[in-house]
Amino acid sequence: MRFLILFLALSLGGIDAAPPVQSRIVGGFNCEKNSQPWQVAVYRFTKYQCGGILLNANWVLTAAHCHNDKYQVWLGKNNFLEDEPSAQHRLVSKAIPHPDFNMSLLNEHTPQPEDDYSNDLMLLRLKKPADITDVVKPIDLPTEEPKLGSTCLASGWGSITPVKYEYPDELQCVNLKLLPNEDCAKAHIEKVTDDMLCAGDMDGGKDTCAGDSGGPLICDGVLQGITSWGPSPCGKPNVPGIYTRVLNFNTWIRETMAEND
């Protein structure tokens, strides 16, 4: 099993370490420039770690397993190696993981049937509000359940190869199908709960991967998921990936933002 994160790992020049659980985009394509204006790049110090989602000028949503001790973020980025004047850099004043996420599962261990990665979400409060522009825009929280069979778009700067990780400079997108949770429950030893979504390509070859954690899953134009965890290697046939079901956490998200604004 893999998280879709690089714990303290991915920099512009390479990788220092790999996590027990990872997620990246395999089998995707270069996103159209500025087509994902809510996409956030979350760094630990100066090293890229995870994706994120801009909810409003003050708040970024990401995965709880992306928790670290020193955040900064980039908004409106497309290519890590290009100077993009429209991109915005922000520091983070507060990180609030969901209180029910089991952080102890981040320690390397052999996957167990009782492993439950539910509640894998975290809010980041920006120290300075984002400037909302054509290339930096928030996305709304969902208001209804996604439909099974929907085509969903995941995006991120995670690995584009399933085993020997290689990371793109350009933001990647991949189209995935929203599948019944039963498909993921059959494919994974870990628990698959109602707080998760199952998405992928049952033929294999398309998936999120190491470095995509915390990024968005957009189904029929609506934010529905946060990239969380999945198989290792990525993109295995009949082994879809797991995403945090955002709709189930709308109340916690809204209340947490209101209490900390």
From Swiss-Prot:
Residues 19-24 form a propeptide. The keyword Glycoprotein applies. Glandular kallikreins cleave Met-Lys and Arg-Ser bonds in kininogen to release Lys-bradykinin. The gene is Klk1. Residues 25-258 form the Peptidase S1 domain. This is Kallikrein-1. It comes from Mus musculus (Mouse). Belongs to the peptidase S1 family. Kallikrein subfamily. It catalyses: Preferential cleavage of Arg-|-Xaa bonds in small molecule substrates. Highly selective action to release kallidin (lysyl-bradykinin) from kininogen involves hydrolysis of Met-|-Xaa or Leu-|-Xaa. Glycans are attached at N102. It holds the Pfam family Trypsin. GO terms for biological process: proteolysis. One of its GO terms (molecular function) is serine-type endopeptidase activity. Its EC number is 3.4.21.35.
